[in-house]
Every structure is written in C-alpha cells, then in structure tokens.
Amino acid sequence: MSEAKPAGGGALVRLLHPRSVAIVGASPTPGALGASVLTNLERSRFSGDIHLVNPNRDVIGNRPCLKSVDALPLGVDVAVLAIPRVAVLDTIRALAARQVGAAVIFSAGFAEGGEAGMKDQRELAAIAAASGMVVLGPNCLGFVNQVHGVALTFVETPAVPLGDQPGVGIVSQSGAMAAVLGVMLGSRALGVSYSISTGNEAVTGVEDYLEFLIDDPRTRVIGMIVEQFRQPRRFLQIAARARQAGKQIVLLHPGRSSAARESAATHTGALAGDHALMTVKVRRQGVVLAESLEELGDIIEIAARCPASPRGGVLYVTESGAFKALTLDLCEQQGVPLPLLDDQNAPLFRAAIPAFVPVSNPLDLTAQALVDPDLYRRTIAAAIADQRFGCIVLGIIQTDPVTSKLKFPPIIKALRELKPGKPVIFAGLDDGAAVPPEYIAGLR
C-alpha cells in the first residue's frame, strides 16, 4: 500500500481540539449513536458550538436541529457522522462544500467489506484530499480528549479531567481495545490525555496521531494497538523522535500468525506485513512491545510512574523458591541484567536478612516477613544503598485480606520513610486476591 501524505498538526488540532462540532444523524433516542455523542459532549462540558443535523426533527432536547448539512455555517471544525454507510460519501461531499475541517466516521463496510467498500473508501480519501479535510475512520469509535473536554465517540465516556500531571495517550486501530485499555488505565489511577481510534485509516493513520502526541506537552507515555502499519518507514522515524523527546511508546502488535493477519484484513482492511521484521525494527527505536492487553497496561503503568529509565541492574525480591526459579527463567529469556549477590559481595543484604536465607538475586525472603515485618524495610534499604541496582521489583505473594494486612502496611511505611531514589515496582502475585483498595492506593 502506498504511503499517504502526512496530516499537518494544525489540521489535527481542528479535529482533536475543536471549537465547533456538528453531529450529523443526531437523535433523541437513548442509545442511538448520535444521541450518545451529544450526551458525551455535554457530560464533558464542551464549551464550543454544537450543531445538530436531523431532517426529521426541529429540536432535540433544548437544541435546534438543522435539516441538512447544507444549512451548517461555513467552517465548522469537525462533523461526526452517525449515519448509515450508504449516506457517507454524499455527506462528506456536502461537508467539504461547507468547508468543514474534519470528520469522524463511525460507519463500517468500507475497505474491510470487499471491493465495493474499498472503492468507496478511495473516493472518500479523494474528497478529503481535494478539500483538505481530516478524516478519522471510517469504522472507528472516534476519540476522547480529556485535556480540553471533548468526547466524540458513541461509547459512554465519563469526564475525567487530566489535572496537572501529564497523562497517557492511546492510539489504536481497534476502537474496542482502545476503550478497554482506557478503562484499565483508569482503574490504575492513570490519567488518559487522548484516546484515539483510527479504524480503517482512509485519510489519517496511527502515524499522524502518534506525531501529534509526541508534540503534546500533556502526554508522557503513548500506548498503541496496531495490527498493521500503513506507513512503516514513517512510523520508525516518528518513534525515533519519541525516543529523543523522552516519550515512551508501548506497542501491542497483533498479527504474528497467518490467521491473525487474515482477521486484520476483515477487521479494518489492514494488509499485515512481516510481523517478525517489524518487531525487530521497532525495538531498535526504543519501542517496548507487549504480548497481551494486560501486559500493555502493566508496561504503560511502569513507564508512566517511572518516567526516567533506570540505569543498572534489577533486584528481584520474592517470597517463593518456585517463583524465584520462574523469575530466573524469564530474566534469561528477556535479557534482563541480574547482578549476582552472595555473602561476600553484598554485606548490606547479609546484615538485613536472616542467616538461613541465602543472599542471592532474586532474593527469596520466604515467609519470614510474616513474623518479622521489618524485614521488608531492611531489604529495601539495602537495595537502595547498593549502586549496582537501578530498579527494585517486589514480587510479594498476596492471597487474602488478613495476609495483606500483615504485609502491605510495613512495605508502604518503608517506602514512605526511605523515599527511594530509584524505581520500586510492586509485582503482586495472585491478582485475584482481595487486597483492600487502600493498600493499592498507598503503594501508588
């Protein structure tokens, strides 16, 4: 597939930070796409102008309706098309005539729907190119901008202002996965700056939005779910820019199997390339690859809470000999540096832990901290003082609220008192354990 002309940053601003929005296919029916978009806009307290278009209604709620796109004022920033696929091309032509800057198209059935759909998608792209219109989609869920309070999506979206801290940007060809990832990050108390679903990428693609987020001061980490890069060379160039700017990209890249590549073609019309080759190339540019959606969330959280990449090795603290062995296998597989520890080269650790516990890395504390809770503090203090370690991972077993009460308070107290100058990652074992939420909040 030939590489499209990049969308300019100014054009994307009209889409992602609009001053005026038109909803084509506005509806009073709860659950209808147009109704959901309006609800999200009002919930996010969008401060710009909202124009509703519905030929069969004079008013929806307290807002007047226009009979057609032709009645829109000139130069509306973005129009959301909550209409059937058969009406999309004529509507895009009419929007171009009204000098609308951008369009969000939910409708499916274009490139992923066979030759006829592909032909219509090419026509859509040609109209947009001739008019300078930015198009998000088709076959997408739209986007959410929590920085400025704009939610142009039909998925119910709570208004969660970003606050003063930089957030996580999400760019995904899959709208459903973008929504799931956003909920996952919210449950981890991580703010999302932008969440953008690109769908079929008829006009703009993941590369355009990645470039926008790299230049966005409110975005620190960028999570991506991409089945196929339509502009791979450009993506690698932008990834290099992200690395220079200190912004971590974390990528979930489905498509390793032939079946997954066929699925991508029916999902977003993507033509998946050489997955193994792309994996090597993106890693060279500092992109971190995730193997699952859950791992994507974990890596994003680590990158967001530890913005400076640690220098030096990793100390793993475990409470299980079996988990120690699993950790050693995984570290060897992933090439994680593990400085060797023993009684002779680690006197601080030897003094901190019981005599029957071997000094090693990973360091297996056994269950001793249940009767000696200060063991956590002594171990963490030794790791902080040891310059061989740039990062500490606490693999703590969590099984029930009673055990959690014995373990979490001394760990939280130790971290608050010691104020580590290096990242400490709490990797609790057994995510199904009923750990009181105040302990999780205390660790964060």
Residue ranges of predicted features:
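Catalytic-core regions of core metabolic enzymes
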Residues: 1-444
